[in-house]
């Protein structure tokens, strides 16, 4: 099963001339791994918005238990634009979350002790087997970022996008023939799509920014 936050799957492609079947409107629930990643991201965002040390510590604890690796797309085409001086979103890593949690704790010994209980993973247990590919980037105002990723036939594929809250982001999944097979185009910047590929091959993931400023996801 391949997952991405942005989460995607990779393997060798086969050539087909017919369209990947579009998934049914009834959405399948997200996997436990993807649910944990999205929960951690939501907690981190809340923690930074409210200066909550406890929320950041819990986000770090969840992330520390989820195997992840950096997404390596087959190709990546970034929409043309600029960040217009907007400050970059804080990295949601275990180390950064705990560092900021300790600062927000303001000497509270209970919170500092909770932060110390979260064991920082040095990376030895975070491999590709059973993990999720993750990537952080910025989609410029009124632009679209395009990722090409290979997914495995018969294995559930999942893609989630969590923005910084400033604009509406939409997520679209296309097969190798350009057919739209899945989308999440609500009015938020939190998106999720899942499908089961009929064949092993390349899929295009498009992240569209509907707003007038860049959005860090």
Predicted regions and their residues:
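Acidic, Ser/Thr/Pro-rich low-complexity intrinsically disordered segments
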Residues: 50, 130, 134-216
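Non-catalytic extracellular/lumenal accessory regions of secreted precursors
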Residues: 63-66, 70, 77-79, 83-148, ...
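Sec/Tat signal peptide C-region and signal peptidase I cleavage site
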Residues: 15-19
């Amino acid at each position: 099963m391949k997952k991405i936050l942005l989460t995607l799957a990779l393997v060798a492609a086969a050539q087909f001339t017919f369209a990947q079947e579009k998934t049914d409107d009834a959405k399948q629930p997200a996997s436990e791994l993807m649910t944990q990643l999205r929960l951690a991201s939501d907690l981190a965002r809340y923690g930074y918005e409210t200066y909550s040390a406890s929320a950041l510590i819990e986000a770090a604890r969840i992330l520390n238990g989820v195997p992840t690796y950096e997404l390596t797309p087959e190709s990546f085409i970034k929409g043309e634009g600029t960040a217009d001086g907007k400050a970059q979103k804080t990295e949601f890593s275990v180390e950064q979350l705990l560092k900021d949690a300790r600062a927000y704790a303001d000497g509270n010994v209970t919170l500092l002790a909770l932060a110390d209980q979260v064991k920082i993973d040095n990376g030895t247990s975070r491999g590709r087997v059973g993990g999720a590919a993750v990537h952080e980037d910025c989609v410029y105002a009124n632009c679209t970022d395009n990722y090409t990723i290979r997914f495995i036939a018969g294995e559930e594929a999942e893609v989630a996008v969590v923005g910084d809250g400033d604009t509406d982001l939409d997520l679209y999944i296309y097969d190798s023939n350009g057919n739209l097979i899945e989308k999440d185009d609500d009015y938020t910047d939190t998106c999720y799509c899942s499908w089961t590929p009929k064949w092993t091959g390349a899929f295009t993931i498009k992240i569209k920014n509907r707003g007038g400023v860049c959005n860090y996801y």
